């Protein structure tokens, strides 16, 4: 086992504090409308420029291992806030820095660290309750635009694009951010259910000028197995041919004789038909076939349910207003499914999302939810250079996360005002002893830090502005972008409640652990280890006896 370096008490805390401050100072310069950029060097390609707190935090590793431990713990605050709400990483880092700095001063003055932590925790619990009372729902498009604009660093075009996307696909719809090809941001909306499986044969194409398969009011056959024998399909094909409607076949695979016969029938115009593979793999494929069947009002022909493809009828088929297929994707528009059944399926998927443990599973379940509930919107980010593209894309993703958080839990006045008002409301609470009271005051002082930093980044005097804001009431605050005071809601400066709440809770959680740290242990640096091993080597005294040898 490698030798360890151990530091205790004040010596350990000073090292840890230095690491906290290095990381937090790098992150906090990005806060607010007049926050600055941070340039990050990359091992390959051009440097990236960002105003995203968590992107800056992730890049920082310190040489001194004890200092690095402090930095990594604050990095954890930013990451947790980012995972929970998708934004508020800079605010969380700043709150953690303030609590750690003030808390360690109190520890150095002889306060009990555990009581300090209890006081901080009590203040945060009360603050979260007050935040919820202060919160107002974010229901209309205007409020969504304002939240998106603030989070995208005062870029109104991004805010309005996100609001438009949410309007078109619903609050539960999937909105993805991609790199565009032009200079301007664009919004592309795919209505209906789209999955990434194209036609099995180009001979199914019935729109040669566009290279698409378009089926109007088709029947949809869903089969949970591979089809290679045409005999299984004959009863369905005959029934569909009599109805004069087109047919879409979605199956695990379609090959050999079955595929060849379908192609010939389609080209001769006997039955207008197209075939695609079912999306996904394994259990996910079964679930997605079930989604499609509910959306279209049909049944999945599955041998597991003792259903026979040869004995199936038109009643087993789903229907839709339109189906469009290209070489990569299939889009089903306006399925004929029962609305109540679709709602029930959506509720079931939501429940699965709540129970899912892995991010990958959650992402796939959210995609399924969106396909059932409205559609998919793609925000294509435009920029002149690759460096600008990366920076812009990160900002748009932040704005999207912030608007989702706002719709979920509502909004509070932005610009650091919400935490200042909350601190005023809970300023009279008391702990069980004086040390806990000091912990409460540490948390209250930290709640002013975001406002102070926004003001500092805009070049004004933080103490003066903070006192002016405290003299006001309700939504009254300071607009750093225009250097004026007034109603933050009227200014359109809003923060999602979830973002502010998550930032405060995670900052207090990690900072409380750091305040109560008494010992730090790390591996000895390699050069120190090798020299100590060399000095203690068994043959190390041999050189001294060499002088008399001739």
Swiss-Prot record:
Cellular component terms per the entry's GO annotation: cytoplasm
Region (Disordered) residue spans: 525-550
Alphabetic keyword roster: ATP-binding, Chaperone, Cytoplasm, Isomerase, Nucleotide-binding
Gene3D superfamilies per record: GroEL (3.50.7.10), GroEL-like equatorial domain (1.10.560.10), TCP-1-like chaperonin intermediate domain (3.30.260.10)
Residues the record lists as binding ATP: 30-33, 51, 87-91, 415, 479-481, 495
Ranges of biased composition (kind: Gly residues): 540-550
GO molecular function term, any single one: isomerase activity
Pfam families reported for this sequence: Cpn60_TCP1
Annotated compartments: Cytoplasm
Catalytically driven reaction(s): ATP + H2O + a folded polypeptide = ADP + phosphate + an unfolded polypeptide
E.C. designation(s): 5.6.1.7
Top EC class, one word: isomerase
Chief place where the protein resides: cytoplasm
GO biological process entries: protein refolding
UniProt entry tagged with the keyword Protein transport: no
NCBIfam families registered for this protein in UniProt: GroEL, PRK00013.1, PRK12849.1, PRK12850.1, PRK12851.1
Function: Together with its co-chaperonin GroES, plays an essential role in assisting protein folding. The GroEL-GroES system forms a nano-cage that allows encapsulation of the non-native substrate proteins and provides a physical environment optimized to promote and accelerate protein folding.
Family from the record: Belongs to the chaperonin (HSP60) family.
Subunit structure: Forms a cylinder of 14 subunits composed of two heptameric rings stacked back-to-back. Interacts with the co-chaperonin GroES.
Protein name, entry field: Chaperonin GroEL
């Amino acid at each position: 086992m490698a030798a360890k370096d151990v530091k205790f008490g004040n010596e350990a805390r000073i090292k840890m504090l230095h690491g906290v401050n290095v990381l937090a100072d790098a992150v906090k310069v990005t806060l607010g409308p007049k926050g600055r950029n941070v340039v990050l060097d990359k091992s390959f390609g051009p440097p990236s420029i960002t105003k995203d707190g968590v992107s800056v935090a992730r890049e920082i590793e310190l040489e001194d291992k004890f200092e690095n431990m402090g930095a990594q713990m604050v990095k954890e605050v930013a990451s947790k806030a980012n995972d929970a709400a998708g934004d508020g990483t800079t605010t969380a880092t700043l709150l953690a820095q303030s609590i750690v700095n003030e808390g360690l001063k109190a520890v150095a003055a002889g306060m009990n660290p555990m009581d300090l932590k209890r006081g901080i925790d009590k203040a945060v619990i009360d603050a979260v309750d007050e935040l919820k009372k202060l919160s107002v729902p974010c229901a209309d498009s205007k409020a969504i635009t304002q939240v998106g604009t603030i989070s995208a660093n005062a870029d109104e075009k991004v805010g309005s694009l996100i609001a438009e996307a949410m309007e078109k696909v619903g609050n539960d719809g999937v909105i993805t951010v991609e790199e565009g090809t032009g200079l301007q941001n664009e919004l592309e909306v795919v209505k209906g259910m789209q999955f990434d499986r194209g036609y099995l044969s180009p001979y199914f194409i019935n729109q040669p000028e566009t290279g698409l398969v378009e089926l109007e009011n088709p029947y949809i056959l869903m089969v949970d197995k591979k089809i290679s024998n045409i005999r299984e399909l004959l009863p369905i094909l005959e029934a569909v041919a009599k109805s004069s409607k087109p047919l879409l076949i979605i199956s695990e695979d379609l090959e050999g004789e079955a595929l060849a016969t379908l192609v010939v029938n389609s080209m001769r115009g006997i039955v207008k038909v197209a075939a695609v593979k079912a999306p996904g793999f394994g259990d996910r494929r079964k679930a997605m076939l079930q989604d499609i069947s509910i959306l279209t009002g049909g049944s999945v022909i599955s041998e597991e349910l003792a259903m026979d493809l040869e004995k199936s009828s038109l009643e087993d088929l789903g229907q839709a207003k339109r189906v469009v297929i290209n070489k990569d994707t299939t889009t089903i528009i306006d399925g004929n499914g029962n609305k109540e059944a679709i709602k029930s399926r959506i509720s079931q998927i939501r429940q699965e999302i709540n129970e899912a443990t892995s991010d990958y599973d959650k992402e796939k379940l959210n995609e399924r939810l969106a396909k059932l509930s409205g559609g998919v919107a793609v925000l294509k980010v435009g920029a002149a250079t690759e460096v600008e593209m990366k920076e812009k894309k990160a900002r748009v993703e932040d704005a999207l996360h912030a608007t989702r958080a706002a719709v979920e839990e509502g909004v509070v006045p932005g610009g650091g005002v919400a935490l200042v008002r909350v601190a005023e409301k809970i300023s009279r609470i008391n702990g069980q002893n004086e040390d806990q009271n000091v912990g409460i005051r540490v948390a209250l002082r930290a709640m002013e830090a975001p406002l102070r930093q926004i003001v500092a980044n805009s070049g004004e005097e933080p103490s003066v502005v903070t006192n002016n804001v405290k003299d006001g009431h309700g939504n009254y605050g300071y607009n750093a972008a225009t250097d004026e005071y007034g109603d933050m809601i009227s200014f359109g400066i809003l923060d999602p409640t979830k973002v502010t709440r998550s930032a405060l809770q995670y900052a207090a959680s990690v900072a409380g652990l750091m305040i109560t740290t008494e010992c730090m242990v790390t591996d000895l640096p390699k050069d120190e280890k090798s020299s100590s091993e060399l000095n203690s080597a068994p043959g190390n005294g041999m050189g001294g006896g060499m002088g008399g040898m001739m």
